A protein has these predicted regions:
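Luminal/periplasmic acceptor-recognition loop/helix of membrane-associated glycosyltransferases
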Residues: 443, 460-514
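Specific aromatic-rich, kink-prone transmembrane helix
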Residues: 160-183, 192-194, 198-199
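Active-site lumenal/periplasmic loops and adjacent helix-entry segments of GT-C-fold
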Residues: 26, 36-143, 147-169, 205-209
């Protein structure tokens, strides 16, 4: 009896050591992922008020100060119609008493960390090898700025948008599906099911469109992970058929579209596969081919899966198959219903090819796992060299996209971009109720780098061709005002003459415009209290 007691006595101590090792390994894992999140920001850059980031930021500023943007307000409110993003960020600003740029930066880093951490947890469900798991997440960190074929999306934007929340939430839902369909006790299964539903609910509140494609991905994954072959095949086919039928039904019941809306919709060439360039089409086909290959048995021989149950697809095979089926279905929907010549563009507006964000995520995880397991292995020098080499194209692409701006724009203080300087001057030297007009395509002016006037200057402005055109293409009620705004600014294009008493200046004043921003070379007799080598701010009334 004494011997038996002596034998049993060390077990609690061994259990404590085992738990301590697990906790320590988790701490190291979190630290590594935090370092990768910082690396991802350093590679991709950070531009909080550029492109879509400026659209969302303007909505946050409006909630914090309702006196901002008193004119043409619809273009400020449009991103907030069906998203809780702006109220959430505004609440964080109020709670933390930090500035909007500071909160946006913290949210950006946190969202990247959450994305990488969830991706690592997915990799941990797929492969036993630590090298494979770290390789998957390291490659994702290096390639976060990768463009998703011709969809006009990046895998992760270099600014904060509603996708900053929906992306990690969709990955968390996929993780929950993998755990729910594995061999876990019933109480834990219910917890994972609840986590899946909660993640998709948060994603839906932030970005309903991306959440919809996330729901499709989770449904496909659940079917493919079933132990019953009938569910695997019939469930997958049913999901694809349901998507095609739903798209056809939406196209059939869509209301007639105005001329202004059709004009706005046709400016979004990335909606239509027929408008894509050949290399963008390669960006659709190549990931599907890679993922189809990764769903085969050879892949499980190269990378040992965590689960080897007869009749049960491994997690990696299920995810690869899911992404392949999801991508093929999205292409079919786009080819059948998202066409420029279609009578309505409702399905095109839903942008089915955005589902390829998930496809690209899965492709990168699979490729990164192979890279870590067979090429990088345990050699620290190889890991460092690989991340430098693989991250370099994304870094160079960001510098090419934002050549006149800092790589990481934490604040506008000391900003060398001349357009941002002119927008800053407008914010500090004009009244809040001022209405501005610019070249409708100013966002593509040399050196402008895609920065949003509205978010930086915090002043009302007539709609532009690019970003406000995107809002008009999604919200049909904005199409007529958008077209009217473009017509009013048609003579503000580069090198156009703008005289104080000209009919065009009178037409702008009739709309309430009090200031214009022109390129430095544009001839005018207006008073321009601010100018630099790229732009000038002129009073028109």
């Amino acid at each position: 009896m004494a011997t038996s007691a002596a034998t049993l006595e060390p077990q609690p101590r061994a259990l404590q050591i085992s738990r301590a090792i697990r906790i320590d390994s988790r701490s190291v894992c979190v630290a590594v992922i935090a370092a990768l999140a910082i690396l991802a920001v350093a590679i991709e850059g950070y531009h909080p008020f550029a492109e879509d980031g400026g659209l969302y930021a303007a909505g946050v500023e409006r909630l914090l100060d309702p006196t901002l943007f008193p004119q043409w307000t619809g273009f400020v409110l449009a991103p907030m119609r069906i998203s809780a993003f702006a109220p959430a960020i505004a609440s964080l600003v109020r709670i933390t008493h930090l500035t909007v740029p500071a909160v946006l930066l913290l949210v950006h880093i946190a969202s990247i960390f959450a994305t990488l951490l969830t991706a690592y947890c997915i990799a941990a469900q797929c492969w036993l090898s630590i090298r494979a798991r770290l390789g998957a997440v390291a490659l994702l960190a290096c390639w976060m700025g990768l463009p998703v074929a011709g969809t006009s999306l990046q895998l992760i934007d270099p600014y904060v948008t509603a996708r900053s929340f929906s992306t990690p939430c969709v990955l968390l839902a996929l993780l929950a599906v993998l755990r729910f369909t594995s061999d876990v006790p019933e109480p834990k299964r219910r917890r994972w099911l609840f986590l899946c539903a909660a993640s998709l609910t948060v994603a839906s509140a932030m970005h309903p469109l991306m959440a919809g494609y996330g729901i499709a991905a989770t449904c496909l994954s659940a079917c493919l992970r079933s132990r019953r072959r009938a569910v695997q095949f019939a469930g997958t086919i049913s999901c694809c058929a349901a998507a095609l039928v739903l798209a056809g039904a939406l196209q059939h019941v869509a209301p007639p579209e105005s001329h202004a809306y059709v004009a706005a919709a046709l400016t979004r060439t990335y909606w239509f596969l027929q408008e894509w360039r050949w290399y963008e089409l390669v960006g659709l086909a190549a990931p599907l081919g890679i993922l189809a290959a990764c769903s085969g048995t050879w892949f499980t021989r190269l990378l040992e899966p965590c689960d080897r149950t007869r009749g049960h697809l491994s997690a990696s095979a299920a995810l690869a198959t899911m992404a392949t089926v999801l991508g093929v279905t999205a292409i079919l929907v786009a080819l059948l219903y998202a066409r420029p010549e279609a009578s309505t563009h409702l399905v095109a507006r839903l942008q089915p090819l955005r589902a390829f964000q998930t496809v690209y995520m899965m492709m990168i995880l699979m490729f990164g796992a192979l890279l870590g397991e067979y090429l990088l292995q345990r050699h620290a020098g190889r890991w460092i060299a690989a991340m430098l080499i693989l991250g370099a194209p994304v870094f160079v692409a960001d510098r090419a996209t934002f050549p006149s701006s800092r790589h990481i724009q934490i604040s506008d203080t000391g900003e060398s971009n001349p357009w941002i300087q002119s927008f800053d001057w407008a914010r500090t030297h004009t009244p809040k109720d001022a209405l501005f007009a610019l070249d409708p395509d100013y966002i593509h002016a040399p050196g402008e780098d895609g920065h949003c006037f509205r978010a930086i200057a915090q002043r009302s402005v007539l709609p532009d061709y690019s970003k406000d055109g995107g809002e008009a293409s999604i919200a049909p009620q904005l199409a007529e005002p958008w077209l009217a705004g473009l017509r009013a600014q048609r003579n503000l294009i580069p090198a156009s003459l703008l005289l104080r008493n000209s009919p065009h200046a009178s037409a702008l004043r009739a709309l309430g415009v009090s200031w214009v921003i022109l390129r430095r070379a544009s001839p005018t007799d207006l008073s321009c209290p601010y100018s630099n080598f790229a732009a000038k701010v002129c009073r028109i009334s």
